[in-house]
Amino acid sequence: MKLLNNCIVAAVALLLCAAPSGDACTSIMVGKKASTDGSVMTAHCCDSYYRTFVTIEPRKTLSPGETEPYFFNVLHKEEPWDTRGVHETGRIVPPALQTYRFVNTAYPCMNEKQLAIGETTFDGNRDLLNRNGVFWIEELERLALQYCDNARDAIRLMGEMAEKYGYADWGECLTVADPNEVWQFEINGPGPGEPGAIWAAQRIPDDHVGISANISRIGAIDFNDPDHFMYCKDLKKKAKALGFYRKGRDKLDSTDGRKWKVYSKQHLQYLSYQRFQTIQTA
């Protein structure tokens, strides 16, 4: 028994060493026909060194012409009033003058309309990183929860605003759910030059369960299926410029990990373990 316990401790230690803190989050998506009571779900474990307090942000009424600030590093605050390391990245013209009430955590997670969001980082290709953008991923979530009441509108708004004002973070996945459906939204920076964003989203079928554990999960994007896929403006053009797309195809295949991130064998083993453990406990 002592030997077995030592082996378990050693295995856990190896797994902890194998993944950096930013690569230890797992998100789960459940369609309404895959749950026992018809509920749509998104669940998210945030395994890193982020803020632990929760606040309920009230509704706000903005004045015509008023702009809204967005920030860097709010997820590391120790208290609601803590501003150390936090700075404004830019201001946007809000899409509406009235906001919804929402639950604010390290990664804002749900609003009063039952729009819910989970998060997991997949890093992405370094060549796509562009720090000149306004939005970091947690602030993009805040934007959606403030102004949207369903998953599709949330994805459209996050995508359009990221393209317009710029996305500054690493490759990220957001699992976006409402009472009817759940989607997986993946976003990268546009590369060097002008701020922008490259993104796509795929709907999880109603009778399916999806798992995203720190690796890009959207494989082929079907441009002829708008009920299951959404994507950024000029995606084909951008993908072609990056060498990710071949002319004449109706699908963009992003399953080649070299396009988005070079994963080490050790890292891939850890990510596979995350997904395996999730399936085992389902």
Per-region residue spans from a language model:
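A contiguous strand-loop segment
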Residues: 25-137, 157-282
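Short, well-ordered beta-strand elements within core beta-sheets of diverse protein domains
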Residues: 141-147
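Sec/Tat signal peptide C-region and signal peptidase I cleavage site
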Residues: 20-24
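Bacterial N-terminal signal peptides that target proteins for export
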Residues: 1-9
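Bacterial N-terminal signal peptides
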Residues: 9-18
